[in-house]
Every structure is written in C-alpha cells, then in structure tokens.
C-alpha cells in the first residue's frame, strides 16, 4: 500500500541497536545486513542524531554504497537533549546531514515528543524550522515520534495538523498496557488520518524471548514461527501502517525477520494480515504475558543520557527481569556485572534518587523504586528509598 507517495514494504531497519565489535559499531557486519535487506526488497532505514555512531555507520554501509533513490532514510531531532538554544537544536539537523551524507532525508522526525520534552520543540520553534527545510528540499516528509498519553497526542496533532505521520510504540505486550496505551495512541493517530510508523514491535527484544508460557502458546499454534515474527506480524497487520521498525543487531536476527517478510516463501512480502485464529493466539499470549510482573524497559537508554551518576539502569533492569523469569540469581548477577560494571556504569546502589531519569523514560517506569528493588535482590545490601 502506498503512503506519502512511497511504496514501502512492512519491515523497516531500525538502526538503534547495531552490532558492536568491542566498543564500536561493526560497520562490516552492518554492510552485510544492509545489502541483504535491500536485496530482499526492503528500503526503509531509521536512525537518529541521538543514536551514538549510527548515522556515521549508515553513511558507510548504505549511503556511500547504494544509489540514493534506492532507499528511504529517516533520522530524528532530539532538541531536549542538551540544547540550550534554537541554534543548538538546528545544529542537530546539520550534524545529521553531515554524518549521514544523505543530501536530504525522506522522513525527518521530532524525536520522542511528550511530557516536558515537547516544550523544547515549541520554545525553539522547530515546527517552523522543519517546514522550512521541507520547502528547501532537504526534508521530504515531516513527523514525530511519541511516547506519552493519547490525550497529549490528541493535543499535538490538533495543534500541528501539518505533521504528516506519527511514529508510535506498538506491540502486543503494550496494546492495553496502561503505562504505554499503544491501542489508544494508535486510534488517535488514525482519527487524525495520520499514517503510522511502528517502533518497538518486539519491545526492545523482550518479545523475542518471552516467558515460557507465551512460548508454549506460539509453539502450539505454529511450531515453525519464531517468537519475534508473531510480534512483528501483529504490528504490521494494523491499518494505516507505513512500516514496522525492527532493531536488528546481527545478521541472524535479520535473517529471521526477512524469512517472515519475504514473498510467498513465507508470510510478508505480499503481506497478509493475521488471521482470526492467529489473533486469538496473540490474545492468549497477551493474557499470559500480563500475568508476569516484568520491568517494561526497552533499553532505549534515554535515562542514561541524563543520569548524573551514570547508573547502569537498563542493564540493571535486564538482570532483574532475568531473575523474575528464570529464578536464577547467580546468572542474573553475572548479567548485572557485565551489563553494568562491564560497560563502565555504576550499580543501582549509587542512585541518589534525583528522579531526572523518570522524566525522560518513554515507558513511564518508576526507575528509582525499581533500582531499590534491583539492589535488594541482586546487590550486597539494602538501598533505602529516598536516600
């Protein structure tokens, strides 16, 4: 289906979690992934100024190696990250042009609108700036990504009908999650007749390795289908979807996704939505998943960008979720040591309870309380709330 003048297939390459070689992005592996993605007929690539090294990597792997008209490139402006003036916010756009070498952006997004973050785009008048760049031909289509309430989304779309699309977090785990409200936000966008780009369809990888009760449900319904494919197909089955972004971190993950997006070899080059029976399977999985109390962290690491003590928040939460799911304290501690200390971060007990992280968390996690819980479960002692 055509959206905004493009024929874009239902899988987009999210460039937030690219493969690493040591501390750096493995550009050679990214080249292999890009080539395979394009060879199978997929063309949409999503990066951001705020994704460390991603724009440089996609310049080397994609822009410098393939015709510009062979792909669509999206990037984002995060005016709420360390911008004290309009000039600094505009500088992010100029940096993105330089780092990607793309010449223009097919899709340009105001990044992570919602709550206190939206006011930066208002104060710096980024709404007019992106329209100016569109008139100059440096941006083809303007939209925004969003992590907040349906009420706030309604306000933004009513105030800015010139926005052409919305990028929303939608997955079967968050469809009725009161902290995310995927369904309600999706319905607001559709009422405003805005096409939707879906992010976090696999919830930061959590739905690729769901708890065993969910795995059993999917295995019974289709033993050959991967867990991630169920999540991606759920999102792609919704009306008005431009594409579904999958943050693929290695060639194996891409192979799995492509196997469910290819022609009649499997499900989705000529895409067929989920059947009624498959929707019932998803509903059973939702019920099973919602009965397990996990920390809903997607490892976006926006919290890490603002934490004054450099706490390894997402790593701590991954380890805690592992403990919740698998009841293996030793393995969870090993995970915490690697994901936190092994990556140069501070442990949960170093949290000073300032709460800055909670203001930028797209998942609305009570981060301070959860860090207390992490330290109580995995640390050497107790961390008192409010200390």
Where would I find each of the regions flagged by the language model?
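N-terminal binding-site loop/beta-alpha segment at the start of enzyme catalytic domains
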Residues: 1-71, 129, 135
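Short, well-ordered coil/turn segments that N-cap beta-strands
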Residues: 6-11, 41-44, 67-71, 101-106, ...
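Active-site mouth loops of central-metabolism enzymes
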Residues: 16-28, 76-88, 116-119, 214-225
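CE4/NodB-like, metal-dependent polysaccharide N-deacetylase domain
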Residues: 39, 88-109, 131-136
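Distinct, well-ordered alpha-helical segments
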Residues: 54-64, 85-97, 101, 118-128, ...
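A short, structured active-site edge motif that brings together acidic residues
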Residues: 69-82, 108-111
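Beta/alpha (TIM)-barrel catalytic core signal, keyed to glycine-rich beta->alpha loops juxtaposed to Asp/Glu
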Residues: 113-298, 302-311, 315-318, 325-336, ...
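Short, basic, low-complexity termini and linkers enriched in Ser/Thr/Gly/Pro
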Residues: 382-387
């Amino acid at each position: 289906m055509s959206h905004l003048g493009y024929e874009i297939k239902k899988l987009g390459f999210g460039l937030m979690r690219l493969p690493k070689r040591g501390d750096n992005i493995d550009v050679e592996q990214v080249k292999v992934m890009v080539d395979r993605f394009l060879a199978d007929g997929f063309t949409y690539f999503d990066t951001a100024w705020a994704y460390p090294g991603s724009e440089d990597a996609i310049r080397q792997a994609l822009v410098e190696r393939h015709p510009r008209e062979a792909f669509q490139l999206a990037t984002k402006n995060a005016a709420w990250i360390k911008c004290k003036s309009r000039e600094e916010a505009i500088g992010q756009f100029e940096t993105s042009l330089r780092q990607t070498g793309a010449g223009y952006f097919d899709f340009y997004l105001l990044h992570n609108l919602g709550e206190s973050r939206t006011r930066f785009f208002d104060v710096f008048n980024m709404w007019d700036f992106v329209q100016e760049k569109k008139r100059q031909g440096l941006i083809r289509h303007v939209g925004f990504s969003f992590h907040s309430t349906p009420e706030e989304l309604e306000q933004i779309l009513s105030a800015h009908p010139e926005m052409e699309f919305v990028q929303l977090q939608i997955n079967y785990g968050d469809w009725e999650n009161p902290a995310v409200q995927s369904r309600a936000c999706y319905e607001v966008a559709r009422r405003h007749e805005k096409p939707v780009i879906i992010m976090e369809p696999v919830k930061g990888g959590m739905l690729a390795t769901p708890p065993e009760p969910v795995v059993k449900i999917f295995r019974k319904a289709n033993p050959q289908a991967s867990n991630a494919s169920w999540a991606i197909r759920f999102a792609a089955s919704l009306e008005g979807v431009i594409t579904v972004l999958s943050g693929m971190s290695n060639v194996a993950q891409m192979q799995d996704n492509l196997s469910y997006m290819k022609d009649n070899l499997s499900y989705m080059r000529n895409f067929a939505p989920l059947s009624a029976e498959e929707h019932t399977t998803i509903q059973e999985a939702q019920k099973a998943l919602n009965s397990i109390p996990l920390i809903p962290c997607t490892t976006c690491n926006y919290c890490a960008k603002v934490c004054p003590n450099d706490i390894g928040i997402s790593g701590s939460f991954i380890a805690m979720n592992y403990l919740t799911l698998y009841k293996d304290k030793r393995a969870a501690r090993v995970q915490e040591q690697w994901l936190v200390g092994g990556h140069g971060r501070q442990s949960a007990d170093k949290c000073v309870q300032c709460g800055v992280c909670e203001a930028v968390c797209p998942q609305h996690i009570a981060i301070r309380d959860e860090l207390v819980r992490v330290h109580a479960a995995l640390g050497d002692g107790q961390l008192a709330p409010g200390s």
